[in-house]
Amino acid sequence: MKRQFEIVSAYSPQGDQPVAIEKLVEGINSGKKKQVLLGATGTGKTFTISNVIKEVQKPTLVMAHNKTLAGQLYSELKDFFPNNAVEYFVSYYDYYQPEAYVPQTDTFIEKDAQINDEIDKLRHSATSALFERDDVIIVASVSCIYGLGSPEEYRELVVSLRVGMEKDRNQLLRELVDVQYGRNDIDFKRGTFRVRGDVVEIFPASLDEHCIRIEFFGDEIDRIREVNALTGEVLAERDHVAIFPASHFVTREEKMKVAIENIEKELEERLKELNDNGKLLEAQRIEQRTRYDLEMMREMGFCSGIENYSRHLTLRPAGATPYTLLDYFPEDFLIVMDESHVSVPQVRAMYNGDQARKQVLVDHGFRLPSALDNRPLTFDEFEEKTNQVIYVSATPGPYELEQSPEVIEQIIRPTGLLDPPIDIRPIEGQIDDLLGEIQDRIAKNERVLITTLTKKMSEDLTDYLKDVGIKVNYLHSEVKTLERIEIIRDLRLGKFDVLVGINLLREGLDIPEVSLVAILDADKEGFLRSERSLIQTIGRAARNENGRVIMYADRITRSMGIAIEETQRRRSIQEAYNEEYGITPKTIQKGVRDVIRATTAAEEPETYEATPAKKMTKKEREKTIAKMEAEMKEAAKALDFERAAELRDLLLELKAEG
């Protein structure tokens, strides 16, 4: 359906936004493949990108480097485009422990996953929207380059129903089962259907409250209605409805037969290879596991871990590029890579990490070699599948700059705020000097961020400041999400005035009350003192009209020189603009929100075993379970499979005793 993108906003582009929009649109219309938008912190990059989408009218994929950032972008874009399809596509695992084998201890860890039903619904909503309309924006995490089923199969297996169409009721039921819908007359939920005489109700995989009621008269569809699944209230009459498959890995029966033959062939070859090499245990293992999966596929049409056979199911040759979300888009689409200095390296790294784990499973007989083809795209494959890309970052990386030497800049903030001035002061006597600066800020009811290089220095500095009566807190890597949000909130509310940390570049640290950022050991070259990190850190003081940065250093390194020069260049552009238009910089006014939803902090393992489960109260048990689940997710994320499996077993015991 041809619908136009339209922005709903009380604001119009300001500052250098109109020029950036014009240049980006011009580049896209003239066929430029890659462009870079260098947008300083707080300049309204999302609003600029929204205007570009509105002007070029192309389906757009916005990629972010984590779920938190993707969630923020999704909310913002949904506000700008309330009448268009803004969709969300991230990994649907709340907790995902991939199957893994640890040869040293002969430990096989089964895949264990907890799927978030809401996110699964949003993923189906995203893919079906791409086949139903043109005005689609999908906000995705980098996991969108992971393998997905074939878009051709997904499109061809759509069950299309129209009023007046001749169709036998039982034929419709068979078609629904073929696209992985289950009949359930009692527990009616997403991905199921129920039958009452001549009425069939279908709960599409992409909806969460509405279902479709099909009323038959003989062998003809008499009426199609959209109904509230809970109350039965009729919401709308429909002439036509398209029911998309309930799984992205759907395969027609004839293809499934060919796939099963090919899997059997591969199994025979692999068994011969393993037996010839004297790997009898591995041969027995792979035969047992694969034959069980094949039996399930013959009987049920699917099996647990069916994605590992995706190469056979889509009849692709070995080593072929897998299908991903990118294949569901039409040919002429736009990709926006947000925070590209992080997301581009992330796309590069995905493939190698995945292959390393799967290779161990293949070598030890847990998976057939074809499982290696259920994988994310390599960087070159990703490049081939992209049409036109806009890289967005305050500090674009070397790859983006090499791809698009002409950078489009967005330096001016709608609030008139300037990049902060930078002082360089000697390391000797830095703490006493810093103490004086902190006291000045406290007197004005402003806040201070201090970044150090080591955990020890952070702890020592925090202790020292506490001893001299400063209200201070320390943000380190062990602080989990929920605590972190609370710490930032308390800093904004003035429960303490100074926040010390090592890496202050993570999201959520744009705090308008902060007027001083102090960088200790600024002259020690390295990851957190590279020019990009320094520019991003300096940006933390750009939300306050009195913002200032102090670098404590005995020499000016190359990175410091570049960061200082770039900040001064941006500041002079901003000052000239403010002078020309008579703008007075004003600190951003941003309400302090309560913590809405996040993960509880997880404690060290020994604290779990300190209180025997039998002696715990119900509340204590629930609290411990929540903490352990959080740590289990963290362990799986950090690829610490043994720890995750150990926690999973502890959890099962706890739940059983509850």
Swiss-Prot record:
Q: What superkingdom does the record give?
A: Bacteria
Q: Does the keyword Phosphoprotein apply?
A: no
Is the keyword rRNA-binding assigned to this protein?
no
* Motif Beta-hairpin positions after renumbering to this chain: 92-115
Residue intervals of the UVR domain: 622-657
Naming one, the record's GO cellular component terms include: excinuclease repair complex
- GO terms for biological process, alphabetical: nucleotide-excision repair; SOS response
Domain Helicase C-terminal, by residue range, is 430-596
**Where is each Helicase ATP-binding domain found?**
26-413
- Where does this protein hold ATP? 39-46
Name the keywords, alphabetized.
ATP-binding, Cytoplasm, DNA damage, DNA excision, DNA repair, Excision nuclease, Nucleotide-binding, SOS response
The molecular function terms in GO held by this entry are:
ATP binding; ATP hydrolysis activity; DNA binding; excinuclease ABC activity
Where in or outside the cell?
A: Cytoplasm
Self-association and partners: Forms a heterotetramer with UvrA during the search for lesions. Interacts with UvrC in an incision complex.
Say what the protein does. The UvrABC repair system catalyzes the recognition and processing of DNA lesions. A damage recognition complex composed of 2 UvrA and 2 UvrB subunits scans DNA for abnormalities. Upon binding of the UvrA(2)B(2) complex to a putative damaged site, the DNA wraps around one UvrB monomer. DNA wrap is dependent on ATP binding by UvrB and probably causes local melting of the DNA helix, facilitating insertion of UvrB beta-hairpin between the DNA strands. Then UvrB probes one DNA strand for the presence of a lesion.
Under NCBIfam families, the record lists: PRK05298.1, uvrb
What family does the database annotate?
Answer: Belongs to the UvrB family.
The free-text domain note is: The beta-hairpin motif is involved in DNA binding.
Query: Any idea what this protein is called?
Result: UvrABC system protein B
> Which species is this record about?
Bacillus cereus (strain ZK / E33L)
Q: Lineage of this protein's species?
A: Bacteria, Bacillati, Bacillota, Bacilli, Bacillales
